[in-house]
Amino acid sequence: MSKTPPTAIHRMVERSRTDDYPAVVAKLESGWVIMGERQVLAGYCLLLPDPVVEHLNVLTGVRRTRFLEDMARTGDAVQHCTGAVRINYAVFGNVEPALHAHIFPRRADEPAATRTSQPWALDWNAAPPYSDDAHGELKRRIGEYLAKSATHESKRS
């Protein structure tokens, strides 16, 4: 259990455990994949560990490996479902002192002025909020890809 006071990450994990959080994409072994609150790049997701921990270095052994594998697998799903040319990953925890990974699809057709910018340089205020109407189909496809990749992974084990 985390020693940090409840953060937005704690609240998102609590909401993910219920059936009323529309942003939930999938439950993975290490935690929850959710759509970013602001879709600054369509398909932007977060991986939230469950249980919440303070930072990556608190995890050891299998739990650390599983989180990082789930992060990469989520990136595979986002890349496949968005047609992204690459995925940007970010793990900070400075503003919200609890482990969480940001997964951003980067596309070849992004405006030249921002194509090489890190995601925090983008206009988050102008980014559309996540909604099932606008992003639900993409969320569903990412979730299906993650479910299929889990099935293939368990067959290899």
Where are these regions (language model features)?
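HIT superfamily nucleotide-processing domains
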Residues: M1-S157
